Structures are given as C-alpha cells and as structure tokens.
From Swiss-Prot:
<dbReference type="GO" id="GO:0050511">
    <property type="term" value="F:undecaprenyldiphospho-muramoylpentapeptide beta-N-acetylglucosaminyltransferase activity"/>
</dbReference>
<keyword id="KW-0808">Transferase</keyword>
<feature type="binding site">
    <location>
        <position position="295"/>
    </location>
    <ligand>
        <name>UDP-N-acetyl-alpha-D-glucosamine</name>
    </ligand>
</feature>
<keyword id="KW-0573">Peptidoglycan synthesis</keyword>
<feature type="binding site">
    <location>
        <position position="128"/>
    </location>
    <ligand>
        <name>UDP-N-acetyl-alpha-D-glucosamine</name>
    </ligand>
</feature>
<dbReference type="GO" id="GO:0005886">
    <property type="term" value="C:plasma membrane"/>
</dbReference>
<comment type="similarity">
    <text>Belongs to the glycosyltransferase 28 family. MurG subfamily.</text>
</comment>
<keyword id="KW-0133">Cell shape</keyword>
<dbReference type="Pfam" id="PF03033">
    <property type="entry name" value="Glyco_transf_28"/>
</dbReference>
<keyword id="KW-0131">Cell cycle</keyword>
<protein>
    <recommendedName>
        <fullName>UDP-N-acetylglucosamine--N-acetylmuramyl-(pentapeptide) pyrophosphoryl-undecaprenol N-acetylglucosamine transferase</fullName>
        <ecNumber>2.4.1.227</ecNumber>
    </recommendedName>
</protein>
<dbReference type="GO" id="GO:0005975">
    <property type="term" value="P:carbohydrate metabolic process"/>
</dbReference>
<keyword id="KW-0997">Cell inner membrane</keyword>
<comment type="function">
    <text>Cell wall formation. Catalyzes the transfer of a GlcNAc subunit on undecaprenyl-pyrophosphoryl-MurNAc-pentapeptide (lipid intermediate I) to form undecaprenyl-pyrophosphoryl-MurNAc-(pentapeptide)GlcNAc (lipid intermediate II).</text>
</comment>
<feature type="binding site">
    <location>
        <begin position="16"/>
        <end position="18"/>
    </location>
    <ligand>
        <name>UDP-N-acetyl-alpha-D-glucosamine</name>
    </ligand>
</feature>
<dbReference type="InterPro" id="IPR006009">
    <property type="entry name" value="GlcNAc_MurG"/>
</dbReference>
<keyword id="KW-0132">Cell division</keyword>
Amino acid sequence: MTALPQRTLMVMAGGTGGHVFPGLAVAHLMQAWGWKVVWLGNPAGMEATLVPKHGIPMEYVRFGGLRGKGLKTKLMLPLNLLRACTQSLSVLRRVKPDVVLGMGGYITFPAGLMTALSGRPLVLHEQNSIAGLANKVLAKVAKRVLVAFPNALPHGEWTGNPIRAELAGAIAPKARYAQRSGPLNVLVVGGSLGAAALNEVVPRAVALLAPNERPRIVHQAGAKHIEALRENYAAAGLQAGADVELVPFIDDMTSAYANADLVICRSGAMTVSEISAVGVAALFVPFPYAVDDHQTTNAAFLADNGAALVVQQRDLSAETLADWLRSQTRETLAEMAERSRSLAKPDATEQVAQICATVAGSISGASPEGKQ
C-alpha cells in the first residue's frame, strides 16, 4: 500500500505564552500523527526562543501591535502591514502548508489574511472569552473558527483551550480532596512576572488569621519579585520557609494545582483552562488592565457555574480575603473543584488537531502506524 505524502501544518502564534503553549500542544500531537509542523512567528517574540527548543522549524515575519506605541509607529502601520503581508505570502509559497492554524498574536493578522487570499485553508482558534479585533476580522475568512469559551466569536465551535496532556490526566478532584486533612493547601500564583496586588495583600491576609486558622501557603511570585515578597511576609510577621513556601517559578504546574485545595491567581485564558482541566477551586483576581477586561469574562465562565469566585482587584483587601479564607472548608472547595472539572474540555488538543486534519482533507488525523 502506497503511503500518503506527508502533510504540513503551519502554526501562527506569538507574543505571549497564552498563544504559544496551546499552539505547541497541537503541534506536538500532529507531529506524533506524522505531520510536518512549521511555525510562523516574530523574531522578536518569545516564540523565537521557545519553539525551536521543541524541535519545530521557524519562519519569521516582523509585525507588532499599536497599543502603547507612539504616533510614528501608528502612522507607519499601513507600510508595516503591507510589508508583513508580503513576507507572509513569501513564507506560504515556500512552506506550502496543507492547513494553517492561527493561535493568536499580532503576527496572525497579516499571515492569516494572506493564507485566505492565497486559497489555503485557515483554522482560527480564539483562546480568550472576548475575541480581539484581528480574530474578529479573520473569523470572516477562516474555514473553521474555534473558541475556548462559548460565544467568543459568532459561529465559533467550542473546543476549549489545547493544554498539556498531563494536566488533563490529573486524578479526579473528589479522590484528591478526600485524602487530605488538616489546614487547607493554598497555591498563590503570580505568574512569571508576578502579580503585585496578590504579593501585597496575601501576606497581610494570612497574618490576620489565627495560627490555627492559617492555610499552608505556596506562593509563586516571579523571580524578580521573590525578595520583595519575602519582605512583605516578614513585615506581616511571617517567615518564609517556616510559615509559607515562596518559589520564583513552578516547573510542574500539574502537581502544584493537584496538591492545592484552592488557587488564588489572575484569570488569563490558559490559567482558567488549566485549573478547570485539573479540577481545583479558584479565587480569581482579574488583571484590571487586560484588553476589553477579558480576564473578568474568562473567570466568569467558571464563577457563573459555581466553580470559582471572582474578586476585582479594587475590592481585594487583606481583611476581606482573611474573612473569606476563614469561612472556607475543604468540603466546599471540593464541590467547587468538581464543578470546575465538569466544565473542562480535556480533549481540546485532539479536537483542534483533528479539525486541522479534516480541513486539510485527511480522512483521519492519526492511524495505528502514526501516519495519515
């Protein structure tokens, strides 16, 4: 039997981990299915360093956003967009992808337009609950429009966010919570850049609790903020190492989530999706300056279903947080975690990959031999 020729997927994603990591999840799965994967990104973006480490070849197009930029950059937009479109078309002609997957980032806009204009199939995925302008435009020319949250785009297919396989494979919340006793386990996640509001409020809130009321705290702060956080806890009368565990970065987020009874964190799209996939109770404090306040809407997907609590940063204080923590029990948090897990889309990676394969004309994404 003659083997079918190897097909090529081109992933367009860049700028932030929220775009890159779900793209990598799909890329790895399709490589396992026998596909060739090429990544289109910006040479100045994090993808230029991260993606090659995963064994995926890169193509580059220079294009950036306008937010926070000066008048000169805004006036140069037409020229920069034209240049990016020309570069994108050149890449498409050279790579000849069977399907292009747009996962977000500024680079997706010119490359997505050229994909559609060149007659190649475009699959678009929106990670947030509120789509940005670029994806709203590209959704009109894409073959399939996929969304992580319901109703993010008109006619979008709800697939969820592609996540790492180990997150979706975590032990069920009911079994995890039932094995525990003693103080609550609270994970505070500030992200790689740290979340100043959490780093300031949480230490003071914990200090307001009596010693027998205090949860076990693991606080991830970001490397640049770890010393300031240590000082915040010290000022609150708490000692790092003895009273709380402070870490600059967490390599194994699956275990960190699974070991927690409660996560206190921002509500970026991937954070919300990962917490739901593992099944853990969450107190979300949305980043107040996110575009279109999309973090509030992301968090609302779980909160509206009794799977999380949302507190706006302006309403977060040491006193209110301490009172809320004092009122929580492992049983109530376990119920919240169960509801969160029930809303997850654990097969999102496979679903997105299969849609890409289908759009490209494959009968099936994978076969027993790992070929198409």
